[in-house]
Amino acid sequence: MTYPVALYLQDAHDIRHGIELAQYAEAKGFDAVWQADSRLVRDAVVPMAAFAANTDRIKIGSGVLDIWTRNAARLASTFSTLDDLAPGRIICGLGAWWDPLASKVGIDRARPLKVMREVVDATRGLLANETVTVDGYHVHLDVVELDYVYQERRAKDVPIYIGATGMQMMELTGEIADGAVLNYLVSPSYNIGALEALARGAAKVGRTLDDIDRPQLVVCSVDDDRQAALDAARLLVTQYLGQQPHIMKASGVPQELLDQIGEVLTWPATHDQVVAASKLVPDEIVQMITASGTPDEVRAKVDEYVAAGCTCPILYPLADDVHLMIDTFAR
């Protein structure tokens, strides 16, 4: 294994435990730790700051912040501050969020491609120590710059990545972003269309696919007991089958299974519903869209994602022993 690997943390672990996991991953040669921020449970910025303050080398990314609830100027000031804490180690990951969660909190995700372009352009300009004026569809800035008073005025080295799933957003990512955070719970073959879209976008501005970093979230359930590893991943797979059936279908999940899952799950699905629906999900589906099983099986599956164009697997641990997962991919 010659490729870099990263750790993905959501809210399953206490933040202090997350700090310890970030330190352990750093000691084992991991390239980055990414903190989730898609559900209404844990803000990414606070744990990112905690990880930054307690590590020395590892990169720290947001995986990913939505572009609707944070003003572009505040995004820039937030990531400028994180860069002060860990210079050159911070990655700004942005995404267009998802429904029905966004609509339930009053966000109309209209024109996400235009909004993403405006937010990325404005945030990048501010981080580059530019004075920015925009009167756009979503972003409105009137001669705005980061208001440094007590520190050196300098451009901040914070690359911007987009967590894209749809092919139009993927193409935009190839055009405007430093990297694409490829989605999880997809089969490696799903990457073919994603990379084609990235390449189309890159070509618009004279770039190639090689100019775009392509880390990918990979659900990773490792256990010396193979069945225990599969069972640990099954509930998340089931929930995602109900929430994102179009992506699952594109990855090769049979429509009949998606229909059966949809008959059981409401939104938001209750734990009992997910448990009931999980009994419909065979081991083959779990293995198709996750890296689950023994350490050797998991390494082989992650190799498939890299062969399909992922530049750095971002490993999302599901089994109880996160240290075992980190050890499995230690550099």
Name the predicted role of every residue range.
Residues 1-62, 158:
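N-terminal beta1-alpha1-beta2 module of alpha/beta enzyme domains
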Residues 29, 51, 82, 123, ...:
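Conserved, mostly hydrophobic/aromatic
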Residues 110-150, 191-193, 199-307:
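An alpha-helical appendage that flanks or caps ligand/catalytic pockets
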Residues 3-16, 65-72, 154-165, 220-221, ...:
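Active-site mouth loops of central-metabolism enzymes
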Residues 13-25, 78, 164-172, 233, ...:
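Short, acidic/polar
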Residues 3-9, 33-35, 60-63, 90-94, ...:
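Hydrophobic faces of well-ordered beta-strands that scaffold small-molecule active sites
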Residues 45-65, 69, 118-122, 126, ...:
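Alpha-helix-loop-beta-strand connector modules within alpha/beta enzyme cores
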